């Protein structure tokens, strides 16, 4: 996280900001605050109940390819950069999203930062990614499954 944050912050231009949400990891939040205390364009946030608002305000979201964050990002149509996965399901999630144009990734932290900054500055790529997210998501799937189950049970 520290290296990726450094790579991103070193590429910020005037007016651009980075928000780093650390959740319950107080040690990481503290060390990031120390690392970036002189940079007014970097905001380190610990646990917050306002992740949805931060996500809605984001031009690009960097996140590991877990199911919840990734699904929320595509539901909100947020351009997405998937960072290093935890081996297993997250590796498959990242491959699924990238192969369908719903996210980008990189082989190392510098490439992740470069790809995310390029995405933030490329309106056409953002539109294409949002279109891919819309085409590959099914926000009403839960409701459809519920109706199908109700129909099957009533027969």
Give, region by region, the residue ranges found by the protein language model.
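Acidic donor-binding loop of glycosyltransferase active sites
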Residues: 56-65
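Donor-nucleotide binding loops and adjacent catalytic segments primarily
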Residues: 1-57
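Structural loop-to-beta junction motif characteristic of Rossmann-like glycosyltransferase folds
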Residues: 59-60, 76-85, 101-102
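Short, glycine/polar-rich helix-capping loops at beta-to-alpha or helix-loop-helix junctions
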Residues: 28-32, 69, 88-94
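Short alpha-helical segment that forms part of, or immediately flanks, the ligand-binding pocket
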Residues: 52, 70-76, 95
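Conserved donor-nucleotide binding/catalytic region of nucleotide-linked donor-dependent transferases
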Residues: 104, 109-110, 117-134, 151, ...
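C-terminal alpha-helical cap of glycosyltransferases
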Residues: 138-155
């Amino acid at each position: 996280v520290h290296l990726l944050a450094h790579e991103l912050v070193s590429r910020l231009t005037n007016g651009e900001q980075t928000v780093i949400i650390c959740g319950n990891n107080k040690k990481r939040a503290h060390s990031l605050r120390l690392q970036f205390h002189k940079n007014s364009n970097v905001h380190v946030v610990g646990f917050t109940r306002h992740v949805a608002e931060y996500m809605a305000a984001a031009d690009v979201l960097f996140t590991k390819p877990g199911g919840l964050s990734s699904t929320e990002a595509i539901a909100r149509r947020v351009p997405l950069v998937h960072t290093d996965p935890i081996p297993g399901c997250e590796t498959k999630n990242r491959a699924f999203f990238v192969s369908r144009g719903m996210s980008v990734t990189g082989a190392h932290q510098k490439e992740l930062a470069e790809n995310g900054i390029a995405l933030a500055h490329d309106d056409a790529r953002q539109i294409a990614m949002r279109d891919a997210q819309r085409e590959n998501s099914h926000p009403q799937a839960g409701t459809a499954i519920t109706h199908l189950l109700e129909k099957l049970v009533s027969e």
